[in-house]
């Protein structure tokens, strides 16, 4: 229901109330001159009553809108981590080729562009630091134990000799892209994994594996590796927002991380043996596709300033617009509002923290145009009429129309500023 329909319904409700009032008043005061129904009233009086009903509906609509706006702005400033939209997330897998001879380190927050077949571009950021190693899973063997349990031999190969061990090694547990089966396998690793050992070299004869020079490894860590998020890692998400991302796409918890020792000479491959105390889960088949190296979780976010606004006292509410309208960006989370003055960029305080002039409030996702939501910046600056100020909004943006234009496969490339 749009605003016009809401206003018209409120007007009909007011006219119904006026009609009931006129009927009750006519019953109590029969000689007042008012008719028992509005349709029988004098045209001038009828128009006056309709005007009263219309303006009453407008006042009621404006008051309701202002109360809702004030309540939402208050919640937005106190609990922004609960009201911010959840961006799209995903996992990109690096496919190694003969051209990759050395590991490639990708920092956390590295920007990528995903271009679909219809030439739409979407901006993504990596969620954690990762390293692409020139390796791939050649084979996986499931070997039953002597009495109980079993062993899983994962044979890694590379197209060129490795001068250094692929440390740290992050592996994604992905069972035919099924979340439930993948988490079932992750639970099996966490509950039944007893030990992990490493053999540096190509696995030729598995039957002779007991004679190999094995190196014992620490048990793997899972998920985000237990590393706390710090400000210098360019992280702007609240811990609750991170938990909301998990419930939207829990695959980031399907990673296991291994610490490998240094190698003394070049190697052409290596084998990792996982020893379990329980048999392999029923209904799951061990194949080389269940453990995937070189995977990076990423998120559809981009940090950039909004269009600058000029607070000159004529208006107090300004739309927060992206500098790239054609890209379909919507405001995900404001990071700060700054005023340009002689000292440079001065941050403004939020209205819920301080009423010191100037301060600001954010009205998020209140205007919808052509299927997109826009937010407003409200400035409390009484001196702006005599002393105009130029303001900038630093924010995180996302592209919610990604799901409408997602076509697989797509081209992914690093974004060069």
Where are the language model's segments positioned?
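Activation corresponds to long, low-complexity, non-globular regions
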Residues: 2, 99-132, 319-360
């Amino acid at each position: 229901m749009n605003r016009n329909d809401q206003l018209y319904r409120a007007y009909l409700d007011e006219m119904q109330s006026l009609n009931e009032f006129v009927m009750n008043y006519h019953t109590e005061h029969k000689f007042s001159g008012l008719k028992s129904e509005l349709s029988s009233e004098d045209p001038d009086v009828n128009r006056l009553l309709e005007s009263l009903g219309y303006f009453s509906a407008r006042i009621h609509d404006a008051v309701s809108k202002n109360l809702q706006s004030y309540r939402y702005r208050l919640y937005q400033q106190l609990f922004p981590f609960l009201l911010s939209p959840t961006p799209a997330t995903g996992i990109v897998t690096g496919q190694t080729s003969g051209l990759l001879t050395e590991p490639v380190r990708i920092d956390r927050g590295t920007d990528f562009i995903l271009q679909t077949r219809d030439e739409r571009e979407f901006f993504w950021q990596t969620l954690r630091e990762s390293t692409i190693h020139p390796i791939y899973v050649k084979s996986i063997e499931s070997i039953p134990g002597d009495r109980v349990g079993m062993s899983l031999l994962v044979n890694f190969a590379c197209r060129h000799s490795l001068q250094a061990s692929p440390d740290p090694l992050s592996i994604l547990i992905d069972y035919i892209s099924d979340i439930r089966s993948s988490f079932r396998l992750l639970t099996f690793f966490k509950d039944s994994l007893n030990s992990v050992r490493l053999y540096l070299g190509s696995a030729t004869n598995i039957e002779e594996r007991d004679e190999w020079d094995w190196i014992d490894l620490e048990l793997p860590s899972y998920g985000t590796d237990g590393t706390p998020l710090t400000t210098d890692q360019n992280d702007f998400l609240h811990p609750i927002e991170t938990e909301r991302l998990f419930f939207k796409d829990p695959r980031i918890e399907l990673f296991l991380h291994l610490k490998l020792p240094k190698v003394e000479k070049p190697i052409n491959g290596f084998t990792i043996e996982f020893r379990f105390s329980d048999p392999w889960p029923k209904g799951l088949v061990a194949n080389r596709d269940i453990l995937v190296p070189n995977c990076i979780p990423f998120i559809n976010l981009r940090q950039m300033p909004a269009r600058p606004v000029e607070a000159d006292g004529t208006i107090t509410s300004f739309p927060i617009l992206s500098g790239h309208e054609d890209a379909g960006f919507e405001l995900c989370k404001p990071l700060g509002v700054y005023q340009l003055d002689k000292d440079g960029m001065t941050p403004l305080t939020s209205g819920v923290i301080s009423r010191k002039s100037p301060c600001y409030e954010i009205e998020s996702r209140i205007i919808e145009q052509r299927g997109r939501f826009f937010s407003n910046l409200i400035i409390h600056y009484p001196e702006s009429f005599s002393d105009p100020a130029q303001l900038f909004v630093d924010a995180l943006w996302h592209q919610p129309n990604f799901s409408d234009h997602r076509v697989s496969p797509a081209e992914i490339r690093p974004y060069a500023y």
